[in-house]
Amino acid sequence: MSMILSASVIRVRDGLPLSASTDYEQSTGMQECRKYFKMLSRKLAQFPDRCTLKTGRYNINFISSLGVSYMMLCSENYPNVLAFSFLDELQKEFITTYNMMKTNTAVRPYCFIEFDNFIQRTKQRYNNPRSLSTKINLSDMQMEIKLRPPYQIPMCELGSANGVTSAFSVDCKGAGKISSAHQRLEPATLSGIVAFILSLLCGALNLIRGFHAIESLLQSDGEDLNYIIAFFLGTAACLYQCYLLVYYTSWRNVKSFLTFGLICLCNMYLYELRNLWQLFFHVTVGAFVTLQIWLRQAQGKAPDHDV
């Protein structure tokens, strides 16, 4: 029978459980899934805002927003659209009931345990689809999941917790490359936003000059083809710096330094077409963006809390 079995509300930055449903089975499979809950709660900051972990007979789904994650355990054949609609209802009610100040300053586990009453009522409704009053909104949720499906977490990304190691850890090499692409960076600073805008500006300037160079070449004005290549390489380098500033990738810092080197080489080649102030601007912006990429690192690992 497809149904929701339990749900939890957890603070993302440190995995502190804020509330949870209290009626759960004591079967071996359920106890194993609760161990997966613990492992996930420690690493929520490293995952995207909508994820699914398949554990065999059960699925763990969660969404994260405003520093709080909403997790649920359901049977493997429970519809995805209902699962994430259920989590969306929990999120809306929790945000309405508790302000961010309370959730950010909470120090005691399960300090919002009274929220369990709403979890239980909502769980009962979603376990009986005939009683659902949200059928109108399910089409919107279904379209959202289709356009932006939840990230499927490989077992090996969980690592180990309290002596329990995932049976799939030995096959983690390939999945590790996937997880790095979804790892979250620290929040953007004002200087980081300025660097992003300046890099886009430099890329746009290079692109415009590149098209003008193509126009001159077509008019047979003797424009060097290598100048066109240099302008477009400079554009690509600036855009890639923007990408590195926003997203986490493996060897991110090395890539940023190599990209900055390409920017310097392009501007050296374009020395005859730009004055010193233009060259100084492009190189300085490239160096500034490289520094911001280096400063904005991946979020650290959260400490343990029992869920």
Swiss-Prot record:
Entry-linked InterPro entries: Longin-like_dom_sf, Longin_dom, Sec22a/c
Membrane topology label: Multi-pass membrane protein
Highest taxon, organism lineage: Eukaryota
Cytoplasmic side: 2-187, 248-253, 296-307
Modification type N-acetylserine: residues: 2
Keywords from the named record: Acetylation, Coiled coil, Endoplasmic reticulum, ER-Golgi transport, Membrane, Phosphoprotein, Protein transport, Transmembrane, Transmembrane helix, Transport
Annotated family: Belongs to the synaptobrevin family.
Protein name, UniProt field: Vesicle-trafficking protein SEC22a
Native source species: Mus musculus
